[in-house]
């Protein structure tokens, strides 16, 4: 896990530049997220530099945006942002929040890069209200185009921590196997296929 955090600490200053090419796709994703978080209390884990949180915060009541990388959070705190948004360094596997604290939990582009994604899902479920919504967009690398495969190859050489290479169908099945009901899914065409999902707690 320390190596994982080191990768993001080293690349925090480059992250926004890297993501810029997918700006149009991310705008579509923000449009999908805003109605879900409207007037809601939101937790985002693996916020990175806060791209998603900053673009949806006007719709939300409040957002706690967290990341394991101190350097990513330092980047996120640069510039002006809404008073409804708070950034902090937290462990997505052991969050400090009380159970059933949030209306919405966002885990964006993180489940494929951690060694135990099911553990993160359990912790997300713990802090989510019974009638809450999990938003979990994830790059599904098994469906990469040829240029995407080349890009992923060089990212791997640079130390990018890819642990799960799902197809969109495999990813949805993974969520269902971890007791989530997928109420909405859309595959967006970014540098890599991005499977956007909204889920509800099947156990409730």
Task: Cite the ranges covered by each PLM segment.
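Conserved class I S-adenosyl-L-methionine
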Residues: 1-37, 51, 55, 75, 135-158, ...
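Class I SAM-dependent methyltransferase SAM/SAH-binding core
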Residues: 43-94
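A short acidic, Gly/Pro-enriched loop at the edge of an enzyme's catalytic core
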Residues: 93-104
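A short SAM/SAH-binding and catalytic strip from SAM-dependent methyltransferases
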Residues: 104-116
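A short glycine-rich, Lys/Arg-flanked "PGG" loop and its adjoining helix->strand segment in the class I
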Residues: 118-130
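Short alpha-helix
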Residues: 163-178
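Core SAM-dependent methyltransferase catalytic element
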Residues: 178-180, 184-204
